[in-house]
From Swiss-Prot:
The keyword Cytoplasm applies. Methylates ribosomal protein L11. S-adenosyl-L-methionine binds at T145, G167, D189, N230. Its main location: cytoplasm. GO terms for cellular component: cytosol. It comes from Alkalilimnicola ehrlichii (strain ATCC BAA-1101 / DSM 17681 / MLHE-1). It catalyses: L-lysyl-[protein] + 3 S-adenosyl-L-methionine = N(6),N(6),N(6)-trimethyl-L-lysyl-[protein] + 3 S-adenosyl-L-homocysteine + 3 H(+). This is Ribosomal protein L11 methyltransferase.
């Protein structure tokens, strides 16, 4: 399948907003590099980007992306035409998997490790999630995914826990929840490629029978003990009336994909349903958690 690669330069302070826009417009993968092209991909948990300007390279399905429209949207976010804008058409799949060279085992919380498929877990006695995300979002290296993984690691998930992973991407949160003890998970995504990646990763980790993968649709009322949604803030706002009642009274919710400046807006949409906790932050990104009111 041919792909279109978009490259641009922007200030570090603008990266989260541009990343969020590119993801919303269908980016399959995003690479970050410093001016001399030393790739860092996504920073690991606790790491900080050290350069004042960064280069973003995003991969899109060539059949669905409009580079001119995309350039105009990026210019709106930046307030000026993007610097270093370059459009390339790619034929082979080698670039899509380049991140694998820099994807190493990572620990989240007290128990959970995310380990690239084919590598040896550093701690055999830990909860080890073997991951091959394909082209779906979610390796654990992005701050939003890392925040959600640490949150799940801190929950007392049990065999009767019903988990919903809304916007499942690679399935990393659904699989992690089941490996950490949840008996059943419903994983939802509108992208067929993400649903396939989730099913594959669930099977490889031995939890395929406990994860139901589906496209968007009505969720059972009060059917979830735990719901995690790592999507964009504007989608969380729009779906508050659908996601909130799907969590049972006393159940837990975690919302991520939220920039610092979007926290108050998202919290306001869910606070009538949930007793919201103080946000957790990693860099410019936030996680909001809460307990469903009775």
């Amino acid at each position: 399948m041919p792909h279109t690669q978009i490259t641009l330069d922007c200030a570090q302070s603008q990266v989260p907003r541009v990343e969020a826009l590119l993801e919303a417009l269908g980016a399959l993968a995003i690479t970050l590099s410093e001016p001399d092209d030393e790739e860092i991909l996504e920073p690991g948990p606790g790491e900080q980007r050290l350069w004042s300007h960064l280069r973003l390279t995003a991969l899109f399905d060539a059949a669905t992306v409009d580079p001119l429209r995309l350039q105009a949207r990026v210019a709106e976010v930046l307030g000026a035409p993007p610097r270093g804008w370059r459009v390339e058409r790619l034929v082979d799949r080698a670039w899509e998997r380049a991140w694998m060279d820099d994807f190493h085992p990572m620990r989240f919380g007290d128990r959970l490790w995310v380990v690239p498929w084919g590598q040896t877990p550093p701690a055999a006695e830990a909860v080890n999630l073997r991951l091959d995300p394909g082209l779906a979002f979610g390796t654990g290296t992005h701050p939003t995914t890392a925040l959600c993984l640490r949150w799940l690691d801190g929950l007392p998930l049990q065999a009767d826990t019903r988990l919903v992973d809304y916007g499942c991407g690679s399935g990393i949160l659904a699989v992690a929840g089941c490996l950490l003890g949840a008996g059943h998970c419903t994983a939802v995504d509108n992208d067929p490629q993400a649903r396939q990646a989730t099913a594959d990763n669930a099977r490889r980790n031995g939890v395929g029978e406990r994860i139901r993968v589906q496209g968007p649709g009505p969720l059972p009322r009060a059917g979830a003990d735990v719901l995690v949604a790592n999507i964009l803030a504007r989608v969380l706002v729009a779906m508050a009336g659908e996601l909130s009642p799907s969590v049972r009274p006393g159940g837990r919710i975690a919302l991520s994909g939220i920039l610092r400046g979007q926290v108050d807006q998202v919290r306001a949409c869910y606070s009538s349903w949930f007793e919201m906790e103080r946000p957790e932050y990693q860099g410019d990104w936030a996680l909001l958690a809460g307990t469903r009111r009775g």
